[in-house]
From Swiss-Prot:
SUPFAM superfamilies per UniProt: HLH, helix-loop-helix DNA-binding domain (SSF47459), Orange domain-like (SSF158457)
Domain bHLH: residue ranges: 52-107
Post-translational modification: Ubiquitinated; which may lead to proteasomal degradation.
Keywords associated with the record: Biological rhythms, Cytoplasm, DNA-binding, Isopeptide bond, Nucleus, Phosphoprotein, Repressor, Transcription, Transcription regulation, Ubl conjugation
Any single Pfam family the record assigns to this protein: HLH
Protein's name in the database: Class E basic helix-loop-helix protein 40
Protein's cellular compartments: Cytoplasm; Nucleus
Domain Orange, residue spans: 142-175
Numbered residues of crosslink Glycyl lysine isopeptide (Lys-Gly) (interchain with G-Cter in SUMO1): K279
InterPro entries reported in the protein's UniProt record: bHLH_dom, HES_HEY, HLH_DNA-bd_sf, Orange_dom
Residue intervals passing through the bilayer: none
Cross-link Glycyl lysine isopeptide (Lys-Gly) (interchain with G-Cter in SUMO2), where in sequence: K167, K279, K288
Length: 412
């Protein structure tokens, strides 16, 4: 312990003061020295008591801090990972406490909601009175489930209609599989769709076959006139100026027209049957040949085509063949209005060198030596006609020149 300097004896090295004897100190006052000594001793004792008090208090504080740190470390380990990822870097103690508080609040809200639902269900079951909305929802769910089940049963039966060894266990297995697919999140069908019938599955192949009978990819229908004109203009399909493609106005006109047309015999034909001429687009343009290079065998049409032509048989829905004006002499052009009005309802048939049967048939009743002028408008010839010997185009032109001109003012 620290000693007070006044209480210590003087050092031995210092010599005693001369002339100081105990008798001389009797008259001196040492009261101030006693007071100082007493006060110092009291201060020392108070400091010792404080040190003895701080020592256990520090230990207690250290233990308390250790417990707090341990609890914060455990909270950090118990926090969910998604909350830990919201912060970057090291999680401080304050951040851990904030995240813990947030997580506890979320759990408390969830528990409160579940508790409210449980109370509502218990009150509803006790009262035994369900609201009308819940009843309607239950009925809709039942109806949708029943329709889905019936649809699956019909589809399964239609698919396995021909199988004789169909068992109920197979149907039940199929329904269980469908239910599992729906529960797993598969796309459920709309309950408003009507249940398919077995006839629908039978009609599908026929409809597919009908769809495949349409025109090909590269086929474009040629635009034709569907009615015969009473004027002297050339009717039919104009292949010199027609490109095979119609504009918007022509498309709208075709949509407005009636889809059915009546023939002379009363039979109705659709637009697809009337337009039988198809122009096919090829990659390379065909080589053009002059009319003088065409032989009898290489004519534009064969005898089978002539038999099925509208001139030789009653086929009003087939496209007519037209005769260009430059092949008819001027004297014969006067007969075009009469022929177009009375003799044939459509355009004049074509006359070329390769058409042996048509040229012979036309010359047989247009020759004035055999048939008179009033008989130039006969009825339609039956198909097919007997084959006549071929004649030259010059002979045909001479026969046309010999026909006497008719009066254009004659009534039909």
């Amino acid at each position: 312990m620290e000693r007070i300097p006044s209480a210590q004896p003087p050092p031995t090295c210092l010599p005693k003061a001369p002339g100081l004897e105990p008798g001389d100190l009797s008259g001196m006052d040492f009261a101030h020295m006693y007071q100082v000594y007493k006060s110092r001793r009291g201060i020392k004792r108070s400091e010792d008591s404080k040190e003895t008090y701080k020592l256990p208090h520090r230990l207690i504080e250290k233990k308390r801090r250790d417990r707090i740190n341990e609890c914060i470390a455990q909270l950090k380990d118990l926090l969910p990972e998604h909350l830990k990822l919201t912060t970057l870097g090291h999680l401080e103690k304050a951040v851990v406490l904030e995240l813990t508080l947030k997580h506890v609040k979320a759990l408390t809200n969830l528990i409160d909601q579940q508790q409210q639902k449980i109370i509502a269900l218990q009150s509803g079951l006790q009262a035994g009175d369900l609201s009308g909305r819940n009843v309607e929802a239950g009925q809709e769910m039942f109806c949708s489930g029943f329709q889905t089940c019936a649809r699956e049963v019909l589809q399964y039966l239609a698919k396995h209609e021909n199988t004789r060894d169909l068992k109920s266990s197979q149907l039940v297995t199929h329904l269980h599989r469908v239910v599992s697919e729906l529960l797993q999140g598969g796309t459920s069908r709309k309950p408003s769709d009507p249940a398919p019938k077995a006839m629908d599955f039978k009609e599908k192949p026929s409809s597919l076959a009908k769809g495949s009978e349409g025109p090909g990819k590269n086929c474009v229908p040629v635009i034709q006139r569907t009615f015969a004109h009473s004027s002297g203009e050339q009717s039919g399909s104009d292949t010199d100026t027609d490109s095979g493609y119609g504009g918007e106005s022509e498309k709208s006109e075709l949509r407005v027209e009636q889809p059915y047309f009546k023939s002379d015999h009363g039979r109705r034909f659709t637009m697809g049957e009337r337009i039988s001429a198809i122009k096919q687009e090829s990659e390379e343009p065909p080589m053009k040949k002059s009319r003088m290079q065409l032989s009898d065998d290489e004519g534009p049409f064969t005898s089978t085509d002539l038999i099925s032509s509208p001139f030789l048989g009653p086929h009003p829905h087939q496209p007519p063949f037209c005769l260009p004006f430059y092949l008819i002499p001027p004297s014969a052009t006067a007969y075009l209005p009469m022929l177009e009005k009375c003799w044939y309802p459509t355009s004049v048939p074509v006359l070329y060198q390769g058409l042996n049967a048509s040229a012979a048939a036309l010359s047989s009743f247009m020759n004035p030596d055999k048939i008179s002028a009033p008989l130039l408008m006969p009825q339609r010839l039956p198909s097919p006609l007997p084959t006549h010997p071929a004649i030259d185009s010059s002979a045909l032109l001479q026969a046309l020149k010999q026909i006497p001109p008719l009066n254009l003012e004659t009534k039909d």
